[in-house]
A protein has these predicted regions:
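Short alpha-helical segment of the dimerization/phosphotransfer core of two-component systems
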Residues: 96-101
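Acidic ATP/Mg2+-coordinating residue in the GHKL
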Residues: 203
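Glycine-rich GHKL/ HATPase_c ATP-binding element in histidine kinases
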Residues: 259-261
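Conserved catalytic submotifs in the C-terminal HATPase_c
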Residues: 23-25, 122-125, 147-157
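Short helix N-cap motif at coil->helix boundaries in the Bergerat
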Residues: 128, 207-218
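Short helix-loop "hinge" at the ATP-lid/N-box region of the Bergerat-fold HATPase_c
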Residues: 176-177
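Short beta-strand/loop element within the Bergerat-fold HATPase_c
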Residues: 183-195
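Membrane-proximal HAMP signal-relay module
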Residues: 1-56, 68-83, 92, 113, ...
Length: 275
């Protein structure tokens, strides 16, 4: 058994195959426990490498377009900008792209921390009603004539990480705003069904075809070019599901093309800690 453990560990150390496991089925109790511990460590190691590869791939894919725009603008300013106005316009474009890159990097880091488990939940008694109400008030929907309708029951509390929960709700609201129609409607509903709080965010926008609904939770997944309009970051729904699951909750979508989407979050209220 020890030779088998050493051989597998050596193979992984040399980087040949991170999927290998010892899989010891016979031996002393001590050897079986040792092999099991090694296999668990190998699983975590493989997951870490895969997450790192995914992060590098995602970052490369999403940072390339704004980087290209910045380089092109720098070249244009250096060669052709002759007036102060042209310089300022070029600098403004560079600033917008740099801000986009900064936002992307921060969201990627947040996602990676959540997946690695290095971002621990800081649960506390949270007034979810107030949290959702505040985020709704902060939404800028006026420019496109979108009306935001609210049906939020008061004084609904849950044991939650308020910062992460705010991020999840904000992402859902932004998603509804970006993919809703001009002069359309967003409806936000929050209520208590017993053990859980239920949050519904509904729009009457472009909707999602059934064959895409299981895929929208993937990082950077885009259904089509029209859904890519806007920030283009494609991290919102993936992060929402990650945050909801960290709270032992669930999220579902009900949608039809050209008929809008309704995202439903099921958030356990949890038990208040005994003081």
């Amino acid at each position: 058994p020890i030779e088998q453990i050493a051989k597998t560990a050596g193979s992984i150390t040399e980087g040949r195959d991170l999927t290998r496991r010892i899989g010891l089925s016979r031996g002393s109790d001590e050897a079986l426990r040792l092999a099991g511990s090694f296999d668990h460590m190998f699983e975590r190691l493989e997951h870490s490498f895969e997450t790192e590869k995914q992060f590098a791939s995602d970052a490369s894919h999403e940072l390339t377009p704004p980087t290209a725009v910045i380089l092109a603008q720098c070249s244009y300013i250096g060669k052709y900008a002759g007036t102060e106005e042209e310089y300022l316009e070029g600098v403004a474009v560079i600033e917008r792209q740099a801000q986009k890159m900064s936002l992307l990097i921060n969201r990627l880091l947040d996602m990676t921390r959540l997946e690695f488990g290095t971002r621990k939940l800081a649960k506390e008694d949270t007034d979810v009603s107030l949290l959702v109400e505040t985020l709704c008030e902060e939404q800028d929907t006026g420019a496109r004539g979108i009306s935001l309708e609210r049906d939020i029951k008061k004084q609904l509390h849950a044991q939650a990480d308020a910062h992460l929960l705010s991020r999840a709700v904000m992402n859902l609201l932004e998603n509804a705003r970006k993919y809703g129609h001009d002069n359309g409607h967003i409806r936000v509903k929050l209520y208590d069904n017993g053990d859980n709080l239920i949050l519904e965010v509904e729009d009457d926008g472009i909707g999602i075809a059934p064959e895409h609904q299981d895929k929208i939770w993937r990082r950077f997944y885009q259904v089509n070019s029209s859904r890519q309009a806007g920030s283009g970051l494609g991290l919102g729904l993936s992060m929402v599901r990650q945050i909801v699951r960290l709270h032992d909750g669930d999220i579902r979508v009900n949608s039809r093309p050209d008929a809008g989407s309704c995202f439903t979050v099921i958030l356990p209220k949890g038990e208040k800690p005994v003081l």
